[in-house]
Regions:
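Active-site-proximal loop/helix segment associated with metal-binding centers of metalloenzymes
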Residues: 100-178
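Conserved beta-sheet core of the metallophosphoesterase superfamily
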Residues: 46, 54-58, 82, 86, ...
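Active-site environment of divalent metal-dependent phosphoester hydrolases
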Residues: 9-16, 37-43, 61-68, 96-97, ...
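Active-site neighborhood of phospho(di)ester-bond hydrolases with catalytic His/Asp-centered motifs
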Residues: 4-7, 31-36, 55-62, 91-92, ...
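Short amphipathic alpha-helices and their capping/turn segments at secondary-structure boundaries
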Residues: 23-26, 80-101, 134-149
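N-terminal active-site segment of His-dependent metallophosphoesterases
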Residues: 1-54, 64-65, 73-75, 147-148, ...
């Protein structure tokens, strides 16, 4: 089974429900983290993450891109992944992966609104914003896939979805959200019958609206694909 969760920030030791659930997963499952994994913040942190389940992480904004970019790459799931440690892999922005027959498109990254209080290449990395090359590669891969995907996984969402779901009192322009807006436009323009689900984290909130799901400490299970598309099911576990 495929399970997806939101930001971890290397804080599973301060949680109860999610770590216990992750311990129940096996090598036959897959876990996808929607950015801000946290266990790549320092090299030694990866030694603290020891679950059997193969774990795949989307780029966030509070991630150490020096470690991410220095990790070796290999072919897996039909595209290129970064190998962070045995059993923990980076899903690269702009790529499409095959998870159990599902086409999973990934576009990570987001703007750190607190970057003015952070130190470049110590606690903040400019690579948090996808590049024009990332965007062009995304378009190229989507075109190769005939604009047909099952899951769109990101760290943040489009400007329109952000405004509709969260009603923030401040306005900050995030280039990542603009790129996601355009990518969604392109997908729906070229494939008007697109039935993908869009899952993201970043906002430390839990909300499901139409085809969009914002996750934080929640875990969802991806169901079987039908003519109506995919369904997700929220995993119920003790909170605390």
């Amino acid at each position: 089974m495929i399970y997806i969760t939101g930001d971890m920030h290397a804080s599973l030791d301060r949680e109860i429900g999610r770590p216990r659930f992750l311990e129940s997963l096996t090598e036959n499952d897959s876990l996808i983290v929607l950015g801000d994994f946290g266990y790549t913040w320092r090299k030694e942190y990866l030694n603290l993450y020891n679950y059997k389940v193969p774990t795949f992480v989307v780029d966030g904004n509070h991630d150490n891109y020096t470690i991410l970019n220095d990790s070796p790459s290999t072919e897996m799931l039909g595209s290129e992944v970064g190998v962070l440690k045995e059993g923990v892999y980076r899903l690269k922005t702009g790529n499409i992966y095959n998870f159990n027959g599902l086409k999973v498109f990934v576009f990570g990254g987001a703007l750190s609104i607190d970057k003015a209080m952070r130190t470049p290449y110590v606690s903040w990395w400019p690579e948090e914003i996808p590049t024009r090359n990332d965007y062009n590669r995304a378009l190229e891969n989507l075109e190769k896939a005939n604009w047909d995907i099952d899951l769109f996984l990101a760290h943040t969402c489009s400007e329109e979805v952000c405004e509709r779901l969260f009603h923030y009192s401040y306005k900050i322009t995030d280039p990542t959200e603009k790129m996601i807006s355009q990518l969604e436009f392109e997908i729906n323009y070229h494939n008007p019958k697109a039935k993908y689900l869009f899952l993201f984290g970043h906002h430390h909130n839990f909300m499901i609206f139409s085809k969009y799901a914002c996750l934080y400490s929640e875990v969802v299970k991806v169901g079987e694909k039908t003519n109506e598309g995919l369904k997700i099911e929220v995993v119920r576990y003790p909170q605390g």
